Structure formats: structure tokens, C-alpha cells
């Protein structure tokens, strides 16, 4: 039930959506019992993007929701243009809601003469006029420090672990991290699933080849257990496919894959469908068309989490409280 203050102030909250994932925006609007503000958005013949809102935005608390699937640059630019239009239309506060933060894997320099593109994205959002960012499961936590303003880093863990607990009760599980760097997150998953043990994949990455990972060996006991293999995203599926093969070779009885972001670039669907996983669970932070779906895929809605976050920000409540101090 929405509070009395929420009802009185609802006219000040406005939700805007880019064209990348309108279904998610409509789900969020439904959770908030409001509508997505209408707009004209189109490309000129040369590909330049134009945006104009149909109603006054003066003094509003604006939330601009845009996911960034392929083509990433198009949708990022559209969100920047929307934010600029809101700033020039005298919106009181502008929050960029970016469920999947673009360029998050370029968060540091691996070698000389490389960009830090995740920082550049943060600078672009600030320059366009964003006062705040809401995002979900960043590739690395340090990206929060790239933006000069509040960053609400939400977690999909509760949604994913809740689904697993409900659908796999009394299962002999082990949580598997795809690499040693995500063991701390795997520990939180283990606690959320009732104190199950952990394992991780030792792997190496060829920095010269995108999306190329070599999985070497499993560290931990997985024989006879159902492995819950976790990651922040599944892109081409190369990392998880190699990990599934290793886990099977080490005697795992079943493998469930859980990730927040289903990028699912080709040939991910084919790989994941043929590697003998029991279920692949992702959220809808990104649109997942029919061409990316396969029988083992389950897509959970992140809309309730985003709506709760928007509500908390609008009412000046605690976003951290949504995660019992873990946000």
C-alpha cells in the first residue's frame, strides 16, 4: 500500500523509458501504479536521435530507465539525450536507472594505452545532467566510485536465491564461483541458501581475445552435488560452458546457472542448451527475445526491485534498507 505522502506527491514523480526495453519500464510503472511518460523518439536519416516529451517536466523527480542491449552505443546515447532534454526542461532531479551498466567490463586498464570506458560512461551521464544512478549487479563494485554523485547498486541475489530455494528444496547443493574474484559474493549466496559449501573455478583469460576464457580446474568438492554456478552476466556463454564441463568432469550430479544479466550474445543459446545444464536462471534487466531463448532458460522480473528502489528514492527513504544493510 502506497503511503499518504506518496499519493500527495505522485504528480512530482515521472518515469521515462528509452526504446531499448519498454516492457521492463511498463512492468515498473505497473508496480508503482503510474504510467510511463509519453514522448516522441526517433532517428533522422543519418542516424541521429531526437527526443521530445509530451508533457511538462518542470520541477519533477525524473527517473530515466534505459537498458543497454546491442546496439549499446545507440541506447546509451538515447538515454543521454533524454537526460539532457529533462535538464533543459527544468526537472528538479534526474535519476538514470540503468539495470545493465554499459561498458562495465572496461573498468580498469589491463595494459598500457587502453581506456577506462566504464568511467567515461559515468562522466557522460553526469555531463548530460544525471544527479543519481540506479543500477543492478555491476561487474565490479569500484564502478560506483566513477560517478560524482549517489549510486544505488542494487543486487539480484535475493530474487535469484529465493527462486532456487523455492524450486530446489532439500537439494545437496554447492555454490560455485566462476573465478576466485567472486568468492566473496559466492559466500553471500551460500549463506542465503542456508549455509551451503563453496567451490570456485580457477581460470585464465587471454587479454588479446574478447570473450575468451580458459577454465582450468575446480577448487572445492562438487562430486555428487547440484552445483549452483553464479555470475553477474552471461554473454556468449563461453565462460559458463567451460565451467559446466569441468564440474561434470569432477562428478557434479547437476548444474544450475544463475546470473543477473542475460546478455546472451550468439552462440550463447546454442551453447547453454547443449551443455547439459538443468536450468539457466537470469533476470530481465535486458530484453531477451525469442531468438535468445531455449528450453532450460528461466527469466525472472527485476521490476519489483527497481520499483521499490525508485519509491525509496522518491520518498527520501533508505535504499540500503531494501537489502538489510547489504546494498
Curated annotation (Swiss-Prot):
UniProt keywords (A-Z) are: ATP-binding, Cytoplasm, Kinase, Magnesium, Metal-binding, Nucleotide biosynthesis, Nucleotide-binding, Transferase
Where is it found, in Gene Ontology cellular component terms? cytoplasm; ribose phosphate diphosphokinase complex
Highest taxon of the source?
A: Bacteria
Q: Which residues form a coiled coil?
A: none
Q: How does the cofactor bind to this protein, according to its record?
A: Binds 2 Mg(2+) ions per subunit.
Where along the chain is D-ribose 5-phosphate bound? 205, 231, 235-239
Where does it reside? Cytoplasm
HAMAP family the record matches: RibP_PPkinase_B
Q: What does the protein in this record do?
A: Involved in the biosynthesis of the central metabolite phospho-alpha-D-ribosyl-1-pyrophosphate (PRPP) via the transfer of pyrophosphoryl group from ATP to 1-hydroxyl of ribose-5-phosphate (Rib-5-P).
Query: What is the protein name for this chain?
Result: Ribose-phosphate pyrophosphokinase
Which organism's genome codes for this protein? Answer: Mycobacterium leprae (strain TN)
Query: Which gene produces this protein?
Result: prs
